[in-house]
Amino acid sequence: MDTKPKTTTTVKVPPGPMGYVYGRACPAEGLELLSLLSARSGDADVAVAPLIVGLTVESGFEANVAAVVGSGTTGLGGTAVSLKLMPSHYSPSVYVFHGGRHLAPSTQAPNLTRLCERARRHFGFSDYAPRPCDLKHETTGDALCERLGLDPDRALLYLVITEGFREAVCISNTFLHLGGMDKVTIGDAEVHRIPVYPLQMFMPDFSRVIADPFNCNHRSIGENFNYPLPFFNRPLARLLFEAVVGPAAVALRARNVDAVARAAAHLAFDENHEGAALPADITFTAFEASQGKPQRGARDAGNKGPAGGFEQRLASVMAGDAALALESIVSMAVFDEPPPDITTWPLLEGQETPAARAGAVGAYLARAAGLVGAMVFSTNSALHLTEVDDAGPADPKDHSKPSFYRFFLVPGTHVAANPQLDREGHVVPGYEGRPTAPLVGGTQEFAGEHLAMLCGFSPALLAKMLFYLERCDGGVIVGRQEMDVFRYVADSGQTDVPCNLCTFETRHACAHTTLMRLRARHPKFASAARGAIGVFGTMNSAYSDCDVLGNYAAFSALKRADGSENTRTIMQETYRAATERVMAELEALQYVDQAVPTALGRLETIIGNREALHTVVNNIKQLVDREVEQLMRNLIEGRNFKFRDGLAEANHAMSLSLDPYTCGPCPLLQLLARRSNLAVYQDLALSQCHGVFAGQSVEGRNFRNQFQPVLRRRVMDLFNNGFLSAKTLTVALSEGAAICAPSLTAGQTAPAESSFEGDVARVTLGFPKELRVKSRVLFAGASANASEAAKARVASLQSAYQKPDKRVDILLGPLGFLLKQFHAVIFPNGKPPGSNQPNPQWFWTALQRNQLPARLLSREDIETIAFIKRFSLDYGAINFINLAPNNVSELAMYYMANQILRYCDHSTYFINTLTAVIAGSRRPPSVQAAAAWAPQGGAGLEAGARALMDSLDAHPGAWTSMFASCNLLRPVMAARPMVVLGLSISKYYGMAGNDRVFQAGNWASLLGGKNACPLLIFDRTRKFVLACPRAGFVCAASSLGGGAHEHSLCEQLRGIIAEGGAAVASSVFVATVKSLGPRTQQLQIEDWLALLEDEYLSEEMMEFTTRALERGHGEWSTDAALEVAHEAEALVSQLGAAGEVFNFGDFGDADDHAASFGGLAAAAAGAAGVARKRAFHGDDPFGEGPPEKKDLTLDML
């Protein structure tokens, strides 16, 4: 396997401090906007906000910096001092530690701090505990305001800090350079800045964490140096402890959170450290291994303590240590993406008032709620994968034989309260007698404590998590019974509520109530088998290979080795360019809008009669046929491209960026990205553990320290081997930049000196920049040398991919969406007897069942039927895509892909297809959906919620999430979206004798079905990705270039549609009414589109709902709704007087044209088939040409 060689680029960064404390008067404008984007709990004066130019930092803010992190002695006598500089980038979050109360809370949920403290104790994680000497020397927010000349009651103080040194501030290893204060302008406001520097500046050659920072007599302090007062602010230190260190501690299974902070800080200061960073006394969670078997270690299952599993525990801590080291490397990286600038956000264009701007931001954040819900409720989400299991040796007879898949991550949220074990497997004192929940089959309810743990026990992040969950659908769209919040609150006035967090007046907004409303979607951990990881990431490139055939005939495959052609010539002959030409021509014909691929363009004005339909379909067919023929001619004759092999190797592919500024402008979204990255890092590290253990005495006390560097190097060697692409940079200081820093002798209130010399500690940076995700286009069988288990798995998949040998309903075929949309124009008389409303379901069902009276069909009708049937049969014969087109864009792309598959002799199996579930937002569809935001609770809850619904414009955050699906991913990916998808990382060696480990990031599934997202369906031939677009919202738009199968309303309705019949619409409506009852009236056109993926039927459903409400005189009545549906069914079931019927079954067959319809029908059918290509024959295209002709030509096919 060839990989791109590592390229080294020189990047110049300015020297500077490792952070700033910003102080400003509370802004009059933009406060509502900042509140929406921030994470804040109502019971705390602190918050986490995003770093945004124009909102929290000034214009021109440099994201990358060579931060001063220490000093070193130089010169012959070691008397001179130079500064040590470390490249890094600023954290995408800023930390508000004074004045946070001026920001509106993210949720009205009460007592979140109490919930986090309770959860922390319950799961055994350490609490924040400042030392007495820290408290004695605290720098309070009031004191800083006084120095800056700000009113403490109206001031806002927040920390802007580099990514790698947040923990250093948390453990008081920094100081404020008060003499270096300056002023900047944010918006129209003047803002003070105080630089933050490390205490290590005053300790030359000391590259470690200072354990006692307030000891001014430390022996490492340089002679005559004026040691400053360390910066300790209790609210800030606690905020960093909870929001920064807490999530990492949960992900790495480290109960001693303070030790994680010190380990991360040490890795930041000491670039040469390679040994263990996490403490030796780390504890482990006790649980039964997967499949109900006892825990096991390779050689010591029965003799290393009562629980066994020694190697499992060792792999757990070493993989966590390696992941922490890898995260530290990424935190020191220099990235290209600038920080977000609110003045350039497209979503704010034209929004003149602060309320309108806040409303636009609120609507966008509600989009992201769908992705947050998927990460919380998917059972294989990175948020839940917090424990390590052991599958045992690959070869039971040879325990030393390494396996990449022996150790793996499993969901641990529900077992986090189990007893803790020490290194030897003994229960830690204090945990005796605790019950042990099983890894599989437990009965634990997902509760507020679990949600707090997912957020690292940070009340601020928990508040923002609830902000998103309050905007998630509880299951109504898939037919689940959603809790009546009003009734629940009213009934709870007489009963006890187990949360102990709320009162009757605040119960509607309580975290417990929100989780109760979403109870039907709670994750259910029914399996602990090794599988995919549900990750949150960001697509930051407008380029992706997500067309129907992926990267088939891509630039890299067509480029000649001699480099004799220019890039443009090669690109014009790729499959990608051919699809772009087809879409451009369709757009020129006004059939499609490339920016909105699901739109019908101007077809409503173009298709005014049946002749126009013929023209549209023929134009699409001829256009695609022409492009495919030209493409294949260029590939075969011009480039001698191995077109069949190219198809077998084709992949759908995209890349997820690790650049922190590509994530959404919200602290919680940044948390999801961080937890996803940590899960990926640990997965890679765990794959190397067994190889490190093989042949070693793992029981030795010094094993971890000795072999942690070995594991770390193995993980670093995985870069650029197919999955984790890395970048190598040479870092240099900006030209002419002076190194300004505090004087080492004059004190921290003295002005900065610019006479320092400095050296960059990490001149050459190698760090991962993106994750590559791919999915094979073709279903691949097991290779000849695959294991028996692998062959069995492939055999079980074959039936899912096997193309059935049945004729497809015309309305479910390639032209179904046009026939339903334009039925009244194409067949104006195609309506049931006694009805004035043309009905496509009735018409085509009767026609295909040979029940349609022939007298109802005109000569023109017969010609059109012949045309439609012939095209549908031709398409069906070559179709290997398990999806029916829903619009012209999909029809053209599917037809094009099928034509290429025909040239390549593809047969038997469906190909893999991609579907994007696009997150959207809307105002609350019902009063119930707005209950959590009601200004008053208790007895006045319903009235308060109705008042809010009556004045939605005054509530910019009152939006809820929704979804729509799209099967053409390239325009979706061009919007550079935030995504959630399943990721399975396979590892394998290269050629024989090569010990290089390659990986592949395989596009997999989210587990949890409709719990994760209501539009996910169980279909092995489809890969899903949840997407929230960024381009056009928070960044500039670019030009276009397996859980268990769950029976849901969505699948029930699509099953009714698939069965067909004249009464499809009424059957769908009846099923929905029986499932949802009065909630049916809440479904908007967007909900119906999401459920049915059929625009015509969705409009029919809205009409049924309107008629049902009219029948009930404005009130919903299930009886009235069913009556309306049954009347519609009776209408379309009438076939009129008996007589000769139209024989659709025989109509259109090649041998029966004349007998069935006479000359006219034969001519119509013949005309419809003129453009058909001859079938592709021959096993060996080379064998069909003349013997003397060596090159393959298209005519041979």
Curated annotation (Swiss-Prot):
The keyword Zinc-finger applies. It is found in: Host nucleus. One of its GO terms (molecular function) is zinc ion binding. A motif (Required for filament formation) lies at residues 843-844, 1142-1144. Residues 1177-1197 are annotated as: Disordered. A zinc finger (unnamed) spans 499-512. Its main location: host cell. Pfam families: Viral_DNA_bp. GO terms for biological process: DNA replication. Residues 1172-1197 are annotated as: Required for nuclear localization. Keywords: DNA replication, DNA-binding, Host nucleus, Metal-binding, Zinc, Zinc-finger. GO terms for cellular component: host cell nucleus. Homooligomers. Forms double-helical filaments necessary for the formation of replication compartments within the host nucleus. Interacts with the origin-binding protein. Interacts with the helicase primase complex; this interaction stimulates primer synthesis activity of the helicase-primase complex. Interacts with the DNA polymerase. Interacts with the alkaline exonuclease; this interaction increases its nuclease processivity. Single-stranded DNA-binding protein required for DNA replication. Belongs to the herpesviridae major DNA-binding protein family. This is Major DNA-binding protein. It comes from Human herpesvirus 2 (HHV-2).
